[in-house]
Amino acid sequence: MQANENVEELVVNRILNDYNYYLRMERAMSQNTVASYCSDVEKFLKFYNANLAQLNDDHIISFLDSRENISKRSQARILSSLKSFCTWLVIEGVIKDNPCDKVDAPKLGRYLPDVLSVEEVQRMMDAVDESSWLGRRDRALLEVLYGCGLRVSEAVGLRVNCLYLDEGCIRVIGKGDKERLVPIGEMASDALVAYLQERPLEFSKAEYVFINRYGTALSRMSAFNTVKKTALSAGIRKEISPHTFRHSFATHLIENGADLRLVQEMLGHESVSTTEIYTHIDSSTWHSSIIEHHPRRK
């Protein structure tokens, strides 16, 4: 990359392709994270449209100011994306220092995620129409999201050969393609077995656990729609997403005394500080194991 090239001369797609390669191959970031970072950087490049060698903190601040209609949390995410991008520019020799180091991140209030009560979780499970194999799939999806605390990308990416139901666990591919073993309780396991037994014979060799009516992997958007549709059927008016089940999973475990570091391992968090957000519900002493304390593992 030449330092004296303008963004309008150095096609945005070329920059993004090179940056995309860096994120995937050198930073080992997940596909979703790479897509998010590149989306933010693309918006910035179109806003900046000048000599990259002259990039400074004022340009970063101006771009963030132009996005003032978005939340502080989104601004913080964008700044993180740009900081990573500028680190790459330093590595490439385009700029000497990272201008984002001089930009203060937006002050964020303590984020308390929305959670479902145990009773609301049960209402959603009961609201699923299991008269077809697709209904059995939806029930199994909800049970796995809540029973294992998976991210939606982890759930729709779950492969049949990653199920070890006799051993009571599943193998999950998380962020950065990092693997972890996650215990699975009886209700989620039974729902999976019931669903897999009902899948059409023509899809018996399908690679992914959760598939659509054509036998291909269920998309993230389809999973979102399934959760929202089921919430409406259950009469729940909260803003519900697949991630709500993950929040509820963690909160209910900690409420019932599960050890914070066990929950951290289950969620696949790099740092226990990320998991500590769930301690806002209950300050009681944490003890025993996840299996003992999840409300749907009894």
Predicted regions and their residues:
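Conserved catalytic core of the tyrosine transesterase superfamily
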Residues: 1-298
